[in-house]
């Protein structure tokens, strides 16, 4: 947060937490550079008459690309192969040795795999459509999807009524929901137990959608193959199987 916030008329915020801040009397509005507003004290703003607005969809394509990249990184050990090359820069026989070592970085195609998309807002719909174009069998769940949103999905994207159907059926699960009471830690010990062995979970939406402790246990046991997230924190950073 900038030093001159105390005199601000308007604040532009990305990820900084504002709940513990004293809102200046001069403040008229807060603009969130993104869709979620969970880092903004909405009740306090309402009491003071501060207008809050967001920018849903502004970064949707960029996040979609990150999710697709995350699925590919989780399917093929590209990171491991890159580290192997970096550790063998002085090896005169690197080309020959790589032929022997590359089997350690083998992976699987995502074509034909089942992807579950939980939350079909601007980002979720783009992910679903792009994954379907890449040959994945896509399932989506969103009880609040609009008619316009549903019509923007490709015809082969399967809409399901519950998250549980996705937890049980899909090889990849990506979450794209806001953080509310119903979604907080929705990826937890109980829901992970429903999932296929070796599932890949992706979270580019909100940090607290996933129970870190349950996820780390699932990674250690092999229940979850990879956890790909845009929210590294002390609980998951450096844990085997985490791509962050």
Where do the protein language model's features map onto the residues?
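Phosphate-binding beta-alpha-beta segment of Rossmann-like dinucleotide-binding domains, i.e.
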Residues: 56-114
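Phosphate-coordination loops involved in phosphoryl transfer and adenosine-cofactor binding
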Residues: 27, 111-114, 189, 198
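N-terminal Rossmann-fold NAD(P) dinucleotide-binding loop
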Residues: 124-125
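Glycine-rich Rossmann-fold phosphate-binding loop(s) that bind the pyrophosphate
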Residues: 113, 120-121
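Aromatic pocket-lining residues of Rossmann-like dinucleotide-binding sites
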Residues: 130-131, 195
């Amino acid at each position: 947060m900038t030093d001159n916030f105390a005199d601000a008329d308007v604040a532009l915020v990305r990820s900084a937490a504002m709940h513990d801040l004293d809102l200046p009397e001069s403040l008229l509005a807060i603009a969130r550079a993104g869709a979620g507003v969970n880092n903004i004290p909405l009740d306090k703003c309402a009491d003071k008459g501060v207008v809050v607005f967001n920018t849903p969809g502004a970064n949707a394509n960029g996040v979609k690309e990150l999710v697709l990249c995350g699925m590919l990184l989780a399917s093929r050990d590209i990171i491991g192969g890159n580290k192997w090359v970096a550790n063998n820069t002085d090896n005169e026989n690197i080309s020959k040795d790589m032929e022997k070592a590359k089997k350690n970085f083998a992976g699987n195609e995502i074509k034909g795999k089942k992807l579950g998309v939980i939350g079909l807002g601007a980002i979720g719909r783009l992910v679903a459509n792009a994954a379907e174009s890449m040959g994945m069998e896509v399932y989506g769940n969103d009880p609040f999807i609009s008619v316009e949103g549903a019509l923007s999905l490709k015809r082969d994207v399967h809409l399901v009524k519950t998250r549980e159907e996705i937890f049980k059926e899909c090889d990849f699960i990506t979450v794209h929901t806001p953080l509310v009471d119903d979604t907080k830690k929705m990826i937890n010990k109980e829901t992970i137990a429903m999932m296929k062995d070796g599932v890949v979970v992706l979270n580019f939406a909100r940090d607290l959608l996933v129970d870190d402790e349950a996820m780390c246990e699932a990674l250690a046991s092999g229940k979850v193959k990879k956890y790909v997230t845009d929210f590294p924190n002390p609980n998951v950073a450096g844990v085997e199987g985490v791509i962050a």
